[in-house]
Design a protein with these regions (language model features):
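Multi-pass membrane proteins that catalyze or facilitate reactions on polyprenyl-/lipid-phosphate substrates
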Residues: 1-294
Length: 294
């Protein structure tokens, strides 16, 4: 992997991770276009690990932006902020469904859904769903009072967590499902976005840690059977590329998150629905014209 490739992948990760357009789908397409992860099973294993580990940069960006909530939860743990403790329990409730489903179906998802056609399908279905929801809201405006983050209950958080499980299908978008879930249970736009970002920190941290600790199962070079996935990735791509990708993800995620909150409050999700349908159509056309294989 060249440095410019790790920089580009980091920018893609940071920009798309918290937008409702699927970072996983974009990274799969970008890696295919650059020929990364296509040489052997071990190369693909390392590429998948790289894509997950640079999420650490995006995690740091959200921790910095939402340090107030993080501090609140830390104070809650030592009994000094009941609201912070409640928020922490709500995040755990939202995280548990994905943790259980992820542990059970992780390998099946990697084996069957990490292809271009599954990504294209989820991009387009999700885009149409967003546009249909926007149309419905215009015809049936919701005038009821909305909940702020402090009024979220663990039962409602669990519903958001169940919807997050759908995003394990690459291309669906974890942010889309959790923001939509937050709006569904009655949160304000700002509260839904904030909960989505904070839940993302917990979910992505767990996914990154699991990848770093997992044993490689690729049927490639012999070292893949003796070292963890993280070491396999570093052997293939080097520490410098991981650092470049992580820093690029952190900076771009910081800017994307700051922009998204205000944008959604002013304009809603429609543009993301249009984008998802458009990029799904473009990638489908590239596959059908054999520009690259599915």
């Amino acid at each position: 992997m060249e440095h410019w490739q790790s920089l580009l992948l980091g920018l893609i990760e940071g920009i798309t991770e918290f937008l409702p357009i699927s970072s996983t789908g974009h990274l799969i397409v970008a890696q295919r276009l650059m020929g990364i992860g296509t040489i052997s099973p071990a190369d693909k294993e390392a590429a998948d690990a790289f894509a997950i580990c640079i999420q650490g940069g995006a995690i740091l960006a959200v921790l910095g932006l939402y340090w107030k909530h993080v501090k609140q939860m830390l104070l809650g743990l030592i009994g000094k902020d009941p609201g912070g403790l409640k928020l922490l329990f709500n995040l755990i409730a939202g995280f548990l469904p994905a943790a259980v489903v992820g542990l059970v179906l992780h390998h099946w998802i990697e084996d069957h859904l990490f292809g271009l056609w599954p990504v294209v399908t989820s991009w387009m279905v999700g885009g149409v769903a967003i546009l249909a929801a926007v149309w419905w809201r215009k015809k049936n405006p919701d005038t009821s009072n909305k909940r702020e983050l402090g009024h979220l209950t663990w039962q409602l958080a669990l519903i958001i967590g169940l919807l997050q499980c759908v995003a394990m299908w690459p291309g669906t978008s974890r942010s889309l499902m959790t923001i939509a879930g937050g709006l569904l249970v009655g949160l304000t736009v700002r509260a839904a976005v904030e909960y989505s970002f904070l839940l993302g920190v917990l979910t992505l941290t767990a996914a990154t840690a699991k990848t770093a600790l997992d044993k490689a199962h690729a049927s490639g070079p012999e070292f893949a059977h003796h070292f963890g996935t993280a070491k396999l990735m570093l052997h293939q791509f080097g520490a410098a590329n991981l650092a470049i990708g992580g820093i690029a993800a952190m900076v771009s995620a910081f800017l994307a998150v700051k922009w998204l909150v205000g944008y959604l409050q002013r304009h809603g999700l429609a543009v993301f629905g249009i984008y998802r349908v458009a990029i799904g159509g473009i990638v489908a056309a590239l596959i059908l014209t054999h520009t690259f294989s599915a």
